[in-house]
Amino acid sequence: MSKPPSDPPRRAPAAFIYEDEATERRDNGRQGGERRKPESFSEHIVVTPDEDDPFLNPDKDLSAVPVAAPRKRRTSFGKIAAGAFGILLSLAIGLWTDSLIRDLFTRADWLGYAALAVLAVGILAVLALVIRETSGMMRLATVQTIKAEADAAMLETRPVKARAVVARLTALLSANPETAKGRATLKATEGEVIDPPHLMALAERELLAPLDRKARALIVNASKRVSIVTAVSPRAVVDLLYVLYEAVRLIRAMAELYGSRPGTLGMFRLLRDVLAHLAVTGSIAVGDSLVQQVLGHGLASKLSARLGEGVINGLMTARIGIAAMDLCRPLAFRALKRPGIGDFIGDLTPSMSPRGNNP
């Protein structure tokens, strides 16, 4: 019976030092010459705080859109000149109207009385227009006043000012049927003792949460329409005109949702504030953060160039909607999460989301 072949002896483990030619030359140079003196490097060193470190906080939204705020109204020489020439033009129109009516009376009395009747109708229409525009401007100012009073009431120890702010907020949103449940909940807590921060948080959740959901739907729908029109339109000027149309429509819908209901002048002021905020923050242009968001979701390799432009224009429309939401919302975001630009990418490109392991 033959013996099984024995295993060959195994080599014992050993350690080897690997040095390349550059390391050998550097070591030989140091051995032959003087060694470098130890030094400390304390200049041009930037220490990143832990809360701002993206590697320690990967869930932090680094591309958050800045909060929009109304512009401060300042008196300028242009406004003074416009007011002076406006008064002069009004006087000229008044003198021309007076001369016209006098000439009509000299020709026939009934022509003069007809001109007076037409003038009275025109004056009444102008007064109604002025009242409507003034009311719209006052509603916009009321929203900003409630927001400022809410910030001040948060610092109080007694809930008196907070109750007053909640009452004004309830009156502002009383015409909206979606706030009926929230108004009933707040009315049931009138006899309870609640500190101001918790009371303002309760008012925000009960009154503004359903409106925020509707506002998000408005932004998503407007962004989708802009994305589709940009993808199929033959000219760039069509894209620009449609983006402006959707932006104005979205801002007006956002103002009406939160109880502002601005007139024509109020709409121009609100549109100017939104565009000024976007111009200052650089959000109206396709910046590095927007490109990073698009590329980070893998759209560059999955979309055509034209469809990619549509997605970018849709994200720009979403930023306009977020800025309008900040301006029209009567309370700042505290108890509820403020929407970010990344919240709308999945809605604009639902087919780009991962589907798991299914083939």
UniProtKB/Swiss-Prot annotation:
The keyword Plastid does not apply. GO terms for cellular component: plasma membrane. The lineage of its organism: Bacteria, Pseudomonadati, Pseudomonadota, Alphaproteobacteria, Hyphomicrobiales. Residues 1-48 are annotated as: Disordered. This is UPF0283 membrane protein RL2646. It holds the Pfam family DUF697. It is a multi-pass membrane protein. Belongs to the UPF0283 family. It comes from the Bacteria. Keywords: Cell inner membrane, Cell membrane, Membrane, Transmembrane, Transmembrane helix. The chain crosses the membrane at residues 77-97, 111-131. Coiled coil: none annotated. It is found in: Cell inner membrane. Residues 23-42 have a biased composition (Basic and acidic residues).
